[in-house]
From Swiss-Prot:
Pfam families per the UniProt record, alphabetical: EMC7_beta-sandw
Region (Disordered): 217-241
Name of the protein: Endoplasmic reticulum membrane protein complex subunit 7
Lumenal topology ranges: 23-158
Compositional bias (Low complexity): 218-234
Keywords, sorted A to Z: Endoplasmic reticulum, Membrane, Signal, Transmembrane, Transmembrane helix
Segments crossing the lipid bilayer: 159-179
Family, similarity comment: Belongs to the EMC7 family.
């Protein structure tokens, strides 16, 4: 009789110890998952909300999807714009909201082994720059996507900056403005200009630039002298009268 009672109590104690161990294991798993990334075992969930300013969620959520690391994990949006992607192990993931009508910036989410979530912007240019984001995610649209490049409008600056036009206009401006800037009455200056232009004119089939410059300057000087003589003649005739 005593042996049976002892066996009964031993079995009862064994069952109670197993129940206590199972409750401790379940409590440790629930404490280790942590925060908003609660999951079963080593699996967690990413949750957030997508917003398009000035547009109701019902007008665009039907064609939108939530992608985690491409198409490794896919989630759907609820009627209020919120989403939850389940069964995600610990690691770093890029979360994107894909919509044909609106553009959303991707977000990187880091999940620790204890279930802690850290979110930040994805910067492909400056990878070392870290901009923290609140969690759960609040993903706001930056506007409609631009699938086409606008055609550039034609302007006068495009015509003037054309290399062919500049090649024709610049020499003309030089020949017109240079005689006005340089003192053509100085023979030494004229001689130096003729020599420099002859050095550039290496092809003998082309017209001589020095002759052109001499004719240009001589014609202007002759015009000045003729105008001066005509003025003196008129003044002399007036005095005689």
């Amino acid at each position: 009789m005593a042996a049976t009672l002892w066996a009964f109590f031993s079995v009862l104690l064994l069952l109670l110890s197993r129940d206590a161990q199972s409750s401790e294991v379940s409590g440790s798993t629930s404490d280790g998952s942590g925060g908003s990334g609660v999951g079963t075992g080593d699996r967690f969930k990413i949750e957030g909300r997508a917003v398009v300013p000035g547009v109701k969620p019902q007008d665009w959520i039907s064609a939108a999807r939530v992608l985690v690391d491409g198409e490794e994990h896919v989630g759907f949006l609820k009627t209020d714009g919120s989403f939850v992607v389940h069964d995600i192990p610990s690691g770093s993931y890029v979360v994107e909201v894909i919509s044909p009508a609106y553009r959303f910036d991707p977000v990187r989410v880091d999940i620790t082994s204890k279930g802690k979530m850290r979110a930040r912007y994805v910067n492909y240019i400056k990878t070392s720059e870290v901009v923290r984001l609140p969690y759960p995610l609040q993903m706001k649209s930056s506007g409609p996507p631009s699938y086409f490049i606008k055609r550039e409008s034609w302007g006068w600056t495009d015509f003037l900056m054309n290399p062919m036009v500049m090649m024709m206009v610049l020499p003309l401006l030089i020949f017109v403005l240079l005689p006005k800037v340089v003192n053509t009455s100085d023979p030494d200056m004229r001689r130096e200009m003729e020599q420099s232009m002859n050095m550039l004119n290496s092809n003998h089939e082309l017209p001589d630039v020095s002759e052109f410059m001499t004719r240009l300057f001589s014609s202007k000087s002759s015009d000045k002298s003729s105008s001066g003589s005509s003025k003196t003649g008129k003044s002399g005739a007036g005095k005689r009268r």
